[in-house]
UniProtKB/Swiss-Prot annotation:
The keyword Transport does not apply. Keywords: Antibiotic, Antimicrobial, Disulfide bond, Endonuclease, Glycoprotein, Hydrolase, Lysosome, Nuclease, Secreted, Signal. The record marks 61 as: Critical for catalytic activity. GO terms for cellular component: extracellular space; lysosome. Interacts (via N-terminus) with bacterial lipopolysaccharide (LPS). This is Ribonuclease K6. Residues 1-23 form the signal peptide.
Length: 150
C-alpha cells in the first residue's frame, strides 16, 4: 500500500500534460467558448482572428473554422432533428442550409507569433448542443462543439 501512493502521484503528474489542448477555459461556459472559437459574423483575417483564441490556451491552435453567422442562427440549428456525433453521442444537429465560413490553418510560427492561411468555404455544418448553463443565452439548447463541416 505504501508503494501505491508514490505511483499514484507519479501518474497524476504525468497525466497533466496530456489533458486535451482543445479543452475550454473553465471561466467560460462551453457555449461562450464555442462562440469565441467559431462565431464570426463578419470575416476577419485569420492571424488576427486566431490570436484571441490562442491567447486563452497559450499555444498556436493548428486549425479552426469560423462560421460567418450569428450565435442566434447557429443556436437555432440545435432545434433541428438530432443526429449521432463523431463521439457517438446523440446531441448533434446539422444545419439546414450551407453558410459562409473560413477555415484557418497554422502555417508557421510559435506562440504568440502564430501564422495562418485562410480558405473561404460555403458548406453545411454539424454542431453538438447541450442545455444552457446559467450565464448562457436562454435557448432550449446551445451549441457547444463544432463537430464537422460537410
Amino acid at each position: 500500500m505504501v508503494l501505491c501512493f508514490p505511483l499514484l502521484l507519479l501518474l497524476l503528474v504525468l497525466w497533466g500534460p496530456v489533458c486535451p489542448l482543445h479543452a475550454w477555459p473553465k471561466r467560460l461556459t462551453k457555449a461562450h467558448w464555442f462562440e469565441i472559437q467559431h462565431i464570426q459574423p463578419s470575416p476577419l483575417q485569420c492571424n488576427r482572428a486566431m490570436s484571441g483564441i490562442n491567447n486563452y490556451a497559450q499555444h498556436c491552435k493548428h486549425q479552426n473554422t469560423f462560421l460567418h453567422d450569428s450565435f442566434q442562427n447557429v443556436a437555432a440549428v440545435c432545434d433541428l432533428l438530432s443526429i449521432v456525433c463523431k463521439n457517438r453521442r446523440h446531441n448533434c444537429h446539422q444545419s439546414s442550409k450551407p453558410v459562409n465560413m473560413t477555415d484557418c490553418r497554422l502555417t508557421s510560427g510559435k506562440y504568440p507569433q502564430c501564422r495562418y492561411s485562410a480558405a473561404a468555404q460555403y458548406k453545411f455544418f454539424i454542431v453538438a448542443c447541450d442545455p444552457p448553463q446559467k450565464s448562457d443565452p436562454p435557448y432550449k439548447l446551445v451549441p457547444v462543439h463544432l463537430d464537422s463541416i460537410l
